[in-house]
Swiss-Prot record:
It catalyses: RNA(n) + a ribonucleoside 5'-triphosphate = RNA(n+1) + diphosphate. One of its GO terms (biological process) is DNA-templated transcription. DNA-dependent RNA polymerase catalyzes the transcription of DNA into RNA using the four ribonucleoside triphosphates as substrates. Coiled coil: none annotated. Its main location: plastid. This is DNA-directed RNA polymerase subunit alpha. It is found in: Plastid, Chloroplast.
Length: 207
């Protein structure tokens, strides 16, 4: 009979990070170095994450008679906005996010920003953001309005992966059937589910 037991020894959050310590126990002998390497490889390869993969910025001058939005390229510098366009895009890419609808793999959203309007108040119904302290931009004038067109995707791969640290801990007593795994991830991820699926796959391969 196969037995694979995963226990949560400790789980905590600090700022925009989640820290998890798991205990892994099995009735099958295995080399802890081999399974540790396989767990890391599998989690990095298979764990899904969510990122803003494309951002288009448009600006409107409310004083202008045209009342048209003009596209901003990465070299555009507007006096009424503290940050350059490329800085705003980099700030957007730094957001640690998760789609509210778990079944969605891709979503395009449009956000309008003004001096009075907060980015996070506009976006909270669509995605969850763990690093709410991440600055996006500062609009200094009431006459300027920015429209953001954001493409958000949920996928596998290093670019999307929410896991930042993986440590496999081998007991000093060399009890190979009883080891621990430490994971540091962004706050909104589904670490336990991904870990269980990863271990189940490795275990069934009869390491």
């Amino acid at each position: 009979m196969k037995l694979l037991k995963i226990s949560i020894l400790r789980q905590s959050t600090f700022k925009n990070k989640k820290y998890n310590l798991f205990k892994i126990k099995t009735n099958r002998d295995f080399n802890p170095l081999v399974i540790g390497t396989k767990i890391r490889r599998n989690l990095i390869k298979e764990t899904k994450g969510t990122k803003i993969t494309q951002a288009s910025l448009f600006v409107l001058n409310k004083k202008s008679k045209e009342k048209l939005y003009h596209s901003l390229n990465e070299f555009t510098n507007i006096e009424e906005i503290s940050e350059k366009t490329n800085e705003i895009i980099k700030n957007l890419e730094r957001l640690k996010i998760k789609l509210v609808n778990k079944n969605l793999k891709k979503k395009i959203i449009c956000i309008t920003l003004t001096k009075e309007n907060s980015f996070f108040k506009e976006i909270y119904k669509t995605i969850k953001i763990s690093n709410l302290n991440q600055k996006i931009c500062t609009i200094k004038s009431h006459n300027v309005e920015i429209k953001l067109l954001l493409k958000i995707e949920k996928e596998k791969g290093i670019k999307f992966n929410p896991i930042e640290t993986i440590n496999f801990i081998i007991p000093k007593k060399n009890n190979e059937n009883n080891s621990s795994l430490f994971l540091e991830t962004i706050r909104n991820d589904q670490t336990f589910t991904e870990l269980y699926q990863s271990l189940k796959l490795i275990y069934n391969q009869q390491i």
